[in-house]
Regions:
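Conserved N-proximal alpha/beta basic substrate-recognition cap immediately N-terminal to
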Residues: 2-115
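Short, solvent-exposed loop/turn segments at secondary-structure junctions
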Residues: 2-3, 50-51, 76, 143-145, ...
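Active-site nucleotide/adenylate-binding loops and adjacent lid/helix of ATP-dependent enzymes
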Residues: 63-66, 74-182, 214-222
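Short glycine/proline- and charge-enriched loop/turn segments
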Residues: 66, 201-209, 252-258
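Conserved hydrophobic "DFG−1" position in protein kinase catalytic cores
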Residues: 152, 187, 240-242
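Beta-strand scaffold of nucleotide-dependent catalytic cores
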Residues: 161-163, 172-174, 182-199, 248-253
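A long amphipathic alpha-helix within ATP-dependent nucleotide-binding catalytic cores
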Residues: 203-247, 271
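C-terminal active-site "lid" helix and adjoining low-complexity regulatory extension at the edge
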Residues: 242-274
Length: 274
């Protein structure tokens, strides 16, 4: 990844724990990958290939050559938030009502004609979509993260104003959960779940171990496990907006979570490294 604090701390911890077993950690180095080249690494913790296409291809090749990559680069490539919402709703996780929207515009290098879009219904019945998800609503990309291109809209006018700024991204329109509590769970190995109080408005982690009731905390952990086992993620963050005791899974496609010490607090940084 591109962080400054996590990679060296993690490598140091691997070296400390792995020394009796002949295991060492190091930064992966890539400089042109030959198709018959064996993987030089037994296990790779991938935290950047979603942003660098060459890295993603190299991670897939590493798997082919016998390496183990966290997270699985094939599923990560195929995944998107809207599909995940639909899967989890079928598995009984509380999910806000969500609509997948046609794109406002398309990348300039794609040669589209009127015939390319003849399957689209026009005009879109925006009132019906808002009636389904409720008002206010959240407009956000159907894939990607980092709180980019996320809008809270109160009505049709605000929705259309925001939608007009979203090209070339495919977006979702989602029910807004006016939460009483909000948590972000660090998850590892699918089963190791660490719920953390989180302020999404300030994007700030808060050390508070009495934040959730035992009942809500247990459901948050159980739902996070369901999500990770269904999607196969071994490193992820899962966000829940909790309203009247019901945890709604808001965001859980984060296979390369931000682990920078100053942002997740020194307390949680040490736990994440371990």
């Amino acid at each position: 990844g591109r962080e400054h604090s996590f990679p060296p701390a993690f490598i140091q911890r691997v070296d400390e724990l792995g020394a009796p077993h002949g295991i060492t950690g190091q930064m992966v180095k890539l400089g042109g990958t030959k198709m018959d080249e064996p993987s030089r690494y037994r296990v790779i913790v991938d935290r950047i290939s979603h942003e660098v296409e060459y890295y993603r291809g190299a991670m897939k090749h590493a798997v082919l050559q016998g390496g183990y990559v966290i997270n699985n680069p094939f599923w990560w490539t195929a995944d998107d938030k809207y599909f995940n919402y639909s899967v989890m709703a079928k598995l009984g996780v509380a999910i806000p009502r969500t609509v997948l929207l046609p794109q406002k515009g398309y990348p300039a290098d794609i040669d589209l004609t009127g015939e390319s879009l003849h399957n689209l219904v026009y005009p879109i019945d925006w009132d019906a979509l808002l009636d389904y998800v409720g008002r206010p609503a959240i407009l956000k990309p159907y894939s990607g993260g980092g709180w980019k291109h996320v809008y809270k809209v109160a009505d049709k006018r605000e929705l259309l104003e925001a939608y007009d700024r979203t090209a070339p991204y495919c977006m979702t329109l989602q029910q807004f959960i006016n939460f009483d509590h909000y948590v972000r769970c660090f998850t590892f190995g699918k089963d190791d779940i660490m719920p953390v109080r989180y302020d999404p408005r300030e994007r700030r982690y808060i050390v508070d171990h009495e934040y959730l009731s035992p009942e809500v905390g247990s459901r948050v952990v159980a739902d996070a496990r369901t999500i990770n086992k269904a999607l196969g993620y071994e490193m992820n963050t899962v966000e829940f907006a909790i309203r009247q005791g019901v945890p709604y899974a808001i965001d859980f496609l984060n296979p390369a979570p931000d682990f920078e010490r100053d942002r997740i607090t020194p307390f949680y940084f040490d736990m994440v490294v371990d």
